[in-house]
Amino acid sequence: MQTMELGRTGEQVSQLALGAMLMGTSTGEDEAFAILDRYLDAGGSFVDTANCYAWWTGPGNTGGESEEVLGRWLTSRRGKVFLATKGSAWVDDPARFRDQPGEPRYSGAAGETLRRELDASLRRLGTDHVDLYYVHVDDLATPLEETLEALAGLVAAGKVRHLGWSNVRTWRLERIRALCERHGWPAPVAVQQQHSYLRPRPGANTRSIVDDEQLHHLRHNPELTLVAYSPLLKGGYGDPARRAHPVMNEYRGEDAEARFAVVADLATQLGVTPNQVVLAWLLHQTSPTAVTLIGPRTLPQFEEALSALELKLTGEQLTYLDSAGA
C-alpha cells in the first residue's frame, strides 16, 4: 500500500484510509476487528472515526460506539496506527433527529465544546492523543478565532498532533489559513470532503463536496491534503437501486448518467467491479493527490476495495474516464 505526505508535515500516511464510521453499530465488533486487522496486514495505517459515529444507524445508538470499538482494538496496536477523529458534530438528542428530515442540531466548535469532546474521545479511544483532529462540520456561529485558539491549545497540550477541517467551503479555508498565519496558530493540514468520480451538478450545494473552486485551491495549497470521503457514493456505481439515496441529490443529471455508463463499460472490459474502477481512478489522481477514505460495512466490501490497489489504469483508460460527461 502506497503512502503519501500529509500536507507538508513530513508525516507519511496511507493513501487508502479506513473509515470506522459503522463499527460498533451496523458492523459488529468481531467483523470490525477482522476488517481492522486485515487493513493493518495489507500495510494500511490511517484509521478515521468521529465522536458522533454512528447515532443515526438505529434506536439505542447515541454516538461514540465507533470510538469505543476502536479503543478496544487499539489496546495493543496504537503505535501502528495514524488515528484521526473529529468533534463539533455531536448530537445530544439523537432520538429526536434520527427520523426527521434535514440537518440535526450539532454541538458546534466553541472552545469549551471542543476541549470537552476531545477529552471524551480520548477516553473512549483509550489513548492520550490523536494524530489528526478535525472540526467535523464547519461552525459559522462560533468566531473562528475562538475555535482556532482552542485547537492550538489542544496541540500545545499534546492531545492532538495535527489539525483538519471537514464539510467546509473554500473561502472559509482561506480565512482559517490567514488567521493561523497572523496569530501563529497551527493551521489545518487536511480537509475531509466528499469527493468521487461524479461531478456535482450545476447549482449543487457543495459545502461538503469538492467543487472546481476547491480543486483549484487544493492544487495551489499543497500544505493541505484532501481526504476524500464517500468515494463510492453509498454504492451507487455498482447498484443502480442505490442511486435513490439522498447522497445523489447533488449529482443527478445527464453528466452523472454519462459517467455511470463509462464506469460500467470500463469495469466490464477489465473484469472488475464499478467500485474498483472508481477507487482506482481516485488513487491515480495527482492534481491534487488525495487520501481515499473507504468505510466498508463488511469484510467482503473491504476486500473488494482493497483489490482496487492492484488495478493499474492506463493513460488511455484514464482519458476515457476523464473525458466522459454531458
Model region roles, listed by residue range:
Residues 7-26, 84-105, 129, 134:
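N-terminal small/glycine-rich loop or linker at the start of catalytic domains
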Residues 32, 66, 114, 118, ...:
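Aromatic/hydrophobic pocket-lining residues that form the small-molecule binding cavity
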Residues 58-64, 91-108, 241-244:
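Surface-exposed, active-site-proximal loop segments in enzymatic domains
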Residues 6, 18, 32, 47, ...:
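Conserved, mostly hydrophobic/aromatic
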Residues 55, 142-326:
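Beta/alpha (TIM)-barrel catalytic core signal, keyed to glycine-rich beta->alpha loops juxtaposed to Asp/Glu
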Residues 27-39, 107-125, 174-178:
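Short, acidic/polar
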Residues 5, 13-17, 45-46, 80-84, ...:
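Structural preference for beta-strand elements that scaffold enzyme active sites
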Residues 1-82, 156, 232-234:
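N-terminal binding-site loop/beta-alpha segment at the start of enzyme catalytic domains
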